A protein has these predicted regions:
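Ser/Thr-rich, low-complexity intrinsically disordered terminal regions
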Residues: 1-145
Length: 145
């Protein structure tokens, strides 16, 4: 899907729909960072992988890994969703994901930000478009950016 994606819906209704879709995905909204009145919703970090075996594979899906030799133990992403009003009923919705992996080198482990592959953004946009339009879309496709 294009990102930003144009949706026909009143902005306040769209913000409410975004909140509902996030709840359905069990992703919590960071109330302190979000500004719904300005059309900005920020989520709390969503852990999508735990454990070294699963995390390595899931991070390869959600991120572009520069170095494959890190010992990843967890993966998480934070979504920033921005609704920009075009006119009374049309809005552009852009979704950006900050993807992080918890990497360890034996003595310490720390969260490292890695480049998003676009999968987290695509998965959310597909669910949002389905919620707004009522039409079921195909599974998310990876696209060259």
């Amino acid at each position: 899907l294009p990102n930003p994606y144009k949706l026909n819906s009143r902005r306040d209704v769209l913000i409410e729909t975004i909140s509902t879709v996030l709840k359905e995905q069990k992703i919590l909204i960071d109330e302190a960072s979000s500004r719904p009145g300005d059309g900005i919703i920020v989520t709390q970090p969503f852990v999508f992988a735990k454990g070294p075996v699963i995390t390595q594979n899931e991070l390869k899906r959600y991120a572009v890994l520069q170095f494959a030799d890190n010992a990843w133990s967890r993966g998480q992403f934070t979504l920033t969703i921005e609704v920009q009003s075009i006119d009374g009923v049309q809005n552009n919705v852009s979704v950006n994901a900050k993807v992080e992996g918890r990497a360890g080198n034996g003595l310490t482990s720390e969260w490292a930000t890695v480049q998003s592959s676009g999968l987290a953004e695509e998965e959310f946009l597909v669910k949002l478009v389905e919620a707004v339009t009522g039409n079921s879309l195909d599974e998310p496709k990876t696209t060259d950016q």
